[in-house]
Amino acid sequence: MELISVTNDNRKDFLKFYKKQYLLSDLKRDSMSGFLKTLLTGKSELCKSVYTEPVMVVDNNEITMISVLVHAQRMPEYIQICFFESDKFNMDAFKLILDRAVKAAEEKGAHKLTGSLNMHVNYGLGFLASDFDKKQSFGSAHNPEFYNAYFEKNGFETIDLVSYKKDMVNSPELINNDIREKLNEVYSVRKSDFKNFKQEIVVYTKINNEAFRDHLFYYRRKTEEDYELFKDLKYLMKEENLLFVEKAGVPVGFMLWYPDFNEIIGKGETAGIKTVIKNKLFSNRIKTFKIVEMGVIPGERNKGAILALFDYCFKRTKEKYDTMESSWILAKNLKSKSFGIKWADEESKHYKAYVKELI
């Protein structure tokens, strides 16, 4: 058994192993292999500021584990163990990757390791830690339970994440008209304008960088990176899926939500052109929507901007979908968690992220 660096000669084998973990599963769907390919070929915007070292463990000429080790210039204290996949539990194989991550940290002057963070929180954070028998939703992680054991048994600190769900069929009005009128006196919510898509991404990036500057694992984004993130997703989205809340005509917050496209992606399919076509023809088959990301600039927090976004979103989804599912929230983020508890029905899937301080 040995650790092998990924080169142009074996890159296809790396990608094939990654995709196999999703395409052969009844519960999982492949939505990230396209981005991973751009990363491995050096074509992603992130490659301009991120060191990547894809590695794989080979045993008897068979790949058994893969990862991309990452060092981001804007988060230099970490070496990230990204895009981690393992076809079966093998601690010896994991320790080969872990040892290389520690060595990479020494080389790059980093002093921490992360597990489950994929380059940046916008691309994924957290291994699944519950509901392993449930289907994966679009944009969320799904993995065997033993993934967590690799990190928990090797001295990593666990960071708990939680998502929420809500019954949209039997749900009462989110707020009454009196509150809605008061919100409308201060805030207005608008759809994004796809005719000026690049400019809308400028607004999105600006709010992100203000809203999440103190968030765990967040580092400043560049507009070009967010544009790359959205340019393919845009073909599945409608303008109403990216909302902005404004005060006196100035954007102060946003909400990204979209249908759970995994409900129309079949087993063995990769998210792509076929998904776009199926979404145009059969979007009514999707019964769940996801609130993926929300952000409000610090000066407008706890003043109603988030509530205005929720109200706008729920009015447009109430009779279209049966269920709402949120993205993950840090379990220690009491304000976000309490908001989820108040406006959702119950907790949904749990996830875990990992950090290890190197001495």
Regions found by a protein language model. Give the residues of each.
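Short amphipathic alpha-helix that is part of the acyltransferase structural core
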Residues: 1-43, 50, 56, 182-222, ...
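Conserved donor-binding loop and adjoining core beta-sheet/short helix segment
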Residues: 25-136, 236, 246-264, 268, ...
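Acyl-donor binding region in acyl/amide transferases
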Residues: 76-154, 272-342
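Acyltransferase donor/substrate-recognition loop-hinge adjacent to the catalytic core
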Residues: 141-215
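Short beta-strand-to-coil "C-cap" segments at the C-terminal boundary of structured domains/repeats
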Residues: 166-169, 355-359
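Long, K/E/R/D-enriched contiguous segments that form extended
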Residues: 198-202, 224-231, 285, 332
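Beta-propeller domains
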Residues: 208-216, 228-244, 255
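Active/binding-pocket-proximal capping segment
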Residues: 222-226, 248, 256-275, 312-316, ...
